[in-house]
Amino acid sequence: MQQSKEERVHDVFEKISDKYDVMNSVISFQRHKAWRKETMRIMDVQPGSQALDVCCGTADWTIALAGAVGEQGKVVGLDFSENMLSVGKQKVEALQLKQVELLHGNAMELPFEDNTFDYVTIGFGLRNVPDYMHVLKEMTRVVKPGGKVICLETSQPTMIGFRQGYILYFKYIMPLFGKMFAKSYKEYSWLQESASTFPGMKELAQMFEQAGLERVQVKPFTFGVAAMHLGIKPESK
């Protein structure tokens, strides 16, 4: 029986959890850290605020958010891979971040009331969900009016020449890195597939608006290899 996308993604991340952080750095040539840092600068997270990190994985962005909201704030990280969460919990415990809670859950059905968080983020996770729009609407539902929904994700470069090189890298080189460093050729082939079919920057910006967000900002990184999308939930009328 053929696996659903959700089942396949779950299997992938359960298997690569112990090598995920190392491979993130290898695949992006360490650029993912700079992308997240610049995204956090644009977000301008306020101390004492409440944040949700959807598809938090091993909790790197969750931890960055915790530093921004401080001890008076609260950050919830949610992921459906228990193995990825286990790695994240070890980091959170080592840093003694009492303002962080990590939950096992599904991005398609966020277990929170409407209008709960000031910021809702998803980093390198939206391309892996079964329905992009449904998850964006869920994120919009749980963010407060005036709050921000942010996606940091791989994208589709538009520069001629660079785009072709990017496609070749993701299709052929990245799975080889997965085999060399994580013994996971098949799993990293999936990451290539999910990235290659993900919407481009303009299309994703339109999806943010269709999900009910306004004042959508788009920030490309490294010639469009990745991009930040940020939208604001309209104030209640």
Swiss-Prot record:
Residue numbers binding S-adenosyl-L-methionine: 58, 79, 106-107
Entry-linked Pfam families: Ubie_methyltran
Catalytic activity: a 2-demethylmenaquinol + S-adenosyl-L-methionine = a menaquinol + S-adenosyl-L-homocysteine + H(+)
Disulfide cross-links: none
Domain of life: Bacteria
Database matches in InterPro entries: MenG_heptapren (IPR014122), SAM-dependent_MTases_sf (IPR029063), UbiE/COQ5_MeTrFase (IPR004033), UbiE/COQ5_MeTrFase_CS (IPR023576)
PROSITE patterns: SAM_MT_UBIE (PS51608), UBIE_1 (PS01183), UBIE_2 (PS01184)
Keywords: Menaquinone biosynthesis, Methyltransferase, S-adenosyl-L-methionine, Transferase
Matches recorded under SUPFAM superfamilies: S-adenosyl-L-methionine-dependent methyltransferases (SSF53335)
EC numbers, comma separated: 2.1.1.163
GO MF term (any one): demethylmenaquinone methyltransferase activity
Residue ranges the record marks as coiled coil: none
Keyword Methyltransferase: yes
Pathway: Quinol/quinone metabolism; menaquinone biosynthesis; menaquinol from 1,4-dihydroxy-2-naphthoate: step 2/2
Enzyme class: transferase
The keyword Methyltransferase is assigned to this record: yes
GO BP annotation list: menaquinone biosynthetic process; methylation
PANTHER family in UniProt: 2-METHOXY-6-POLYPRENYL-1,4-BENZOQUINOL METHYLASE, MITOCHONDRIAL (PTHR43591:SF24), METHYLTRANSFERASE (PTHR43591)
Similarity comment: family membership: Belongs to the class I-like SAM-binding methyltransferase superfamily. MenG/UbiE family.
Described function: Methyltransferase required for the conversion of demethylmenaquinol (DMKH2) to menaquinol (MKH2).
HAMAP family listed in its UniProt record: MenG_UbiE_methyltr
Protein name according to UniProt: Demethylmenaquinone methyltransferase
